[in-house]
Amino acid sequence: MRVLALTAAVILAALPARAAAQQPDDREQVRLAVADYVDGFYQGDSTRLVRSVSPEVRKNGYWRASPDSAYRPSAMPYPAFMRFAAGVQAGRNRPPANAPREIVIFDVQDQTASAKLTAWWGTDYLLLGRENGRWMITHVLWQSPPPRPATR
């Protein structure tokens, strides 16, 4: 009985170490999913979008047509992702040469993750879920770049 208790204690002690060992790999997989998302838009690569975005994605946000205009709500369903990528391939919707591509991973758990992307269109807050072993973007809340403070 004592051996059984000792064995159970060793196994239980090893479990957090194993979970922690998986965390960096999961963080990297989440980062790669977000990178596929932004590069899919920047390069017009629908393959990357298919690889990283759930067809059930919900993307909602707030955009401004110009720096002095008001924000307007905007929704982007999955088919619009593919149309946008096709537009980039056709020479429309291209990002500026110095377009930002900053990815910050906030949290990664066993089934869910969250991240922030700063891109040329603004800031995206992304929620990801593990679907069939892959990290997929399921929700995006975004906004155009905020107004810059007035200079004197």
Residue ranges, per PLM feature:
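Short, low-complexity N-terminal intrinsically disordered segments enriched in polar/charged residues
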Residues: 19-47, 51, 55, 73, ...
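Bacterial N-terminal signal peptides
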Residues: 5-14
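Residue-level "edge-of-site" marker
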Residues: 54, 62, 143
